[in-house]
Curated annotation (Swiss-Prot):
Skewed-composition ranges (Polar residues): 1-12
Region entry Coil 1B, spans: 83-216
Superkingdom of origin organism: Eukaryota
Molecular-function annotations in GO: double-stranded DNA binding; JUN kinase binding; phospholipase binding; sequence-specific double-stranded DNA binding; structural constituent of nuclear lamina
Lipid-binding residues (covalent, S-farnesyl cysteine): 585
UniProt-recorded name of the protein: Lamin-B1
């Protein structure tokens, strides 16, 4: 054991204080047996005390468990009553919603009748407007004839002004070319001086290099003379001859290069000087001809100015007549615009009323669906806790909610609890959503969000599908919008791509998630249809979603069908139910 008992400490002290006297083997064996028996008795006493304390603690824990189970039972009973109350309130709200929906449908029929009457009135006003537009076109034809005459006069004026501007531009160009020629002559003079300086510097450099080469030759010759001391006289003469021949060839090469460079400089200088002289002569002759043309242009401008004054008088008369016609046309346009704005305002008011009724209807439908889902979630949570606590289940009722034509199952597990299989069957006695889809190619339309947030496509084949030039068209009633894929986009085999609206709150993650920045929503309505066309304009897939609304004649008893809700133990305990503790003690 970890600690020694007081009896053991006392015996150890007595053994330490005993005199060291010799004992017989029998005495020693008896003492050892006696000591072992005492130790075993001490250990047994400690063990009995430990067992008693554990039994006491176990009884206290069992009492706590019993009390907590009683508290949990009371809380569960209260929570069940609270859920039943909320369920009854939700059912009453659902009934009120159904009645309100029927009223709204009746009002919608009235508004449709009023809308048809307004359409008839609008057609009559359209015929009146077409007559006014015919008169307007007649006035515009007369105005166009006058505009043509005025445009002819203005065109002649502009052509004369253009000729004058062309002559001025030619004079400016000639003066600019003359100044450029003078500048070129100065540049050529400077270039000549620069080339002469460069020739002088190159000559000096050549002289310097020649001196350096001679020094190097002398140095090389001295080195060879020192090396040729050990060589016989025949070999020495041969080396000197080769060295002299090599030096002679180097001198000839350098002289030839210097001569070529001098000849090139002289040829370049003479050619540029001749070009400058010819350019100066040409510029002088051009300036003289330009002066003659300028004199002729001045005389022509004077004659054209007199003609222009006459045309301006005629133009002023035409402008006065045009002003009168424009005033008459403005009055007619104001009257037509006023009538058209009145019709548009009436149509806008009718559209706003219809849109308000539709939005109210959609809000009521969303409230109903949310209530149904919440009721199912509460009931499923309650049944899960009853099953976990092994309580008798309450009588179930059935509530149906329609969100899509498909069904799905959700499985949740927690520790060693029993797995709960929840199946969502989506149908409604009052509102139902039906889907229909077809595809003739590798790509199909997998899903259309009923809230207008996204449309999802899927490549069902084992090959990549290029989507360049493909178009996806969404139709709701008479309105339609289209989305085109980029030329480089490719949908991988077995992959899905989701095209999100701009207000969906999703960030782009190509190639699986794309954002349509120009469209805030794909749109919602009772009849939504999406068509997918390839780059040749052929329809390869389509999917439609139709909302069917019926008014129930009488309310029947409904059975509960749980919607996919994950039953989590932590959420239940946050609402006030304590956790059960299961502890046991093992006595070794």
């Amino acid at each position: 054991m970890a600690t020694a008992t007081p009896v053991q400490q006392q015996r150890a002290g007595s053994r330490a204080s005993a005199p060291a006297t010799p004992l017989s083997p029998t005495r020693l064996s008896r003492l050892q047996e006696k000591e072992e028996l005492r130790e075993l008795n001490d250990r047994l006493a400690v063990y009995i005390d430990k067992v008693r304390s554990l039994e006491t603690e176990n009884s206290a824990l069992q009492l706590q468990v019993t009390e907590r189970e009683e508290v949990r039972g009371r809380e569960l009973t209260g929570l069940k009553a609270l859920y039943e109350t909320e369920l009854a309130d939700a059912r009453r709200a659902l009934d009120d919603t159904a009645r309100e929906r029927a009223k709204l449908q009746i009002e919608l029929g009235k508004f449709k009748a009023e809308h048809d009457q307004l359409l008839l009135n609008y057609a009559k006003k359209e015929s009146d407007l077409s007559g006014a537009q015919i008169k307007l076109r007649e006035y515009e034809a007369a105005l166009n004839s006058k505009d043509a005459a005025l445009a002819t006069a203005l065109g002649d004026k502009k052509s004369l002004e253009g000729d004058l501007e062309d002559l001025k531009d030619q004079i400016a160009q000639l003066e600019a070319s003359l100044s450029a020629a003078k500048k070129q002559l100065a540049d050529e003079t400077l270039l000549k001086v620069d080339l002469e300086n460069r020739c002088q510097s190159l000559t000096e450099d050549l002289e310097f290099r020649k001196n350096m080469y001679e020094e190097e030759i002398n140095e090389t010759r001295r080195k060879h003379e020192t090396r040729l001391v050990e060589v016989d006289s025949g070999r020495q003469i041969e080396y000197e001859y080769k060295l002299a021949q090599a030096l002679h060839e180097m001198r000839e090469q350098h002289d030839a290069q210097v001569r070529l460079y001098k000849e090139e400089l002289e040829q370049t200088y003479h050619a540029k000087l001749e070009n400058a002289r010819l350019s100066s002569e040409m510029n002088t002759s051009t300036v003289n001809s330009a002066r003659e043309e300028l004199m002729e242009s001045r005389m022509r401008i004077e004659s054209l100015s007199s003609q222009l004054s006459n045309l301006q008088k005629e133009s002023r008369a035409c402008l006065e007549r045009i002003q009168e016609l424009e005033d008459m046309l403005a009055k007619e346009r104001d009257n037509s615009r006023r009538m058209l704005s009145d019709r548009e305002r009436e149509m806008a008011e009718i559209r706003d009323q219809m849109q308000q009724q539709l939005s109210d209807y959609e809000q009521l439908l969303d409230v109903k669906l949310a209530l149904d889902m919440e009721i199912s979630a509460y009931r499923k949570l309650l049944e899960g806790e009853e099953e976990r606590l092994k309580l008798s289940p309450s009588p179930s009722s059935r509530v149906t909610v329609s969100r899509a034509s498909s069904s799905r199952s959700v499985r949740t597990t927690r520790g060693k609890r029993k797995r709960v299989d929840v199946e969502e069957s989506e149908a409604s006695s009052s509102v139902s959503i039906s889907h229909s889809a077809s595809a003739t190619g590798n790509v199909c339309i997998e899903e259309i969000d009923v809230d207008g947030k996204f449309i999802r496509l899927k490549n069902t084949s084992e090959q990549d599908q290029p989507m360049g030039g493909w178009e996806m068209i969404r139709k709701i009633g008479d309105t339609s919008v289209s989305y085109k894929y980029t030329s480089r986009y490719v949908l991988k085999a077995g992959q899905t791509v989701t095209v999100w609206a701009a207000n969906a709150g999703v960030t782009a993650s190509p190639p699986t998630d794309l954002i349509w920045k120009n469209q805030n929503s794909w749109g919602t309505g009772e009849d939504v249809k999406v068509i997918l066309k390839n780059s040749q304009g052929e329809e390869v897939a389509q999917r439609s979603t139709v909302f069917k609304t019926t008014i129930p004649e009488e309310e029947e008893e409904e059975e509960e069908e749980p919607i996919g809700v994950a039953v989590e133990e932590e959420r239940f305990h946050q609402q006030g139910a304590p956790r059960a503790s299961n502890k046991s003690c093992a006595i070794m």
